[in-house]
């Protein structure tokens, strides 16, 4: 994620096996479509077991996902962000500070979430 330094990032940790993850993906894609042109970077990190690459590709195709999807079966991402399950999502400001953390599914395309992201996009790095 160091590649995204200085950018506003929505980091979603998920798995193909997770029903709430399936529920929230369409809203994440809608948010991405609306806010990526303004500078938001959406990164979804799958924590599926080793060997799940085809499953992950199929999931992304099924939902028409256009944002970056990473695969981290080692557990390093869960350790780094001290997650307790999936989905778990972080909104990270340009300065690298986590501004919002949500455990469980959320409507990421809601007015409140879009307003937060718009505010963070308007802020310049500190």
Map each language-model feature to its residues.
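Thiol/disulfide oxidoreductase modules built on the thioredoxin-like
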Residues: 58-66, 71-119
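A short beta-strand-turn-helix
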Residues: 1-9
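Conserved hydrophobic packing residues within short motifs/helices of P-loop NTPase cores
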Residues: 9-11, 43-45, 90
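Aromatic-flanked redox-active Cys/Sec active sites in thiol-based oxidoreductases
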Residues: 12-18, 47
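Short amphipathic alpha-helical/adjacent loop interface patches that line ligand
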Residues: 8, 25-28, 114
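Structural microenvironment flanking redox-active thiols in thiol-disulfide oxidoreductases
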Residues: 22-63, 73-80
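Non-globular targeting/processing and membrane-anchoring segments
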Residues: 124-126
């Amino acid at each position: 994620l160091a590649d995204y330094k200085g950018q506003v990032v929505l980091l979603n940790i998920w798995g193909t096996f997770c029903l709430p993850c399936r529920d929230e993906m369409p809203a994440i894609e809608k948010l991405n479509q609306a806010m990526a042109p303004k500078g938001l970077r959406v990164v979804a990190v799958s924590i599926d077991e080793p060997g799940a690459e085809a499953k992950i590709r199929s999931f992304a195709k099924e939902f028409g996902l256009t944002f970056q999807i990473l695969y981290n079966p080692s557990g390093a991402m869960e350790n780094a962000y001290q997650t307790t399950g999936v989905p778990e999502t972080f909104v990270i400001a340009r300065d690298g500070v986590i501004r919002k953390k949500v455990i469980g599914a959320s409507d990421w395309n809601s007015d409140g979430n879009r307003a937060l992201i718009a505010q963070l996009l308007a802020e310049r790095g500190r």
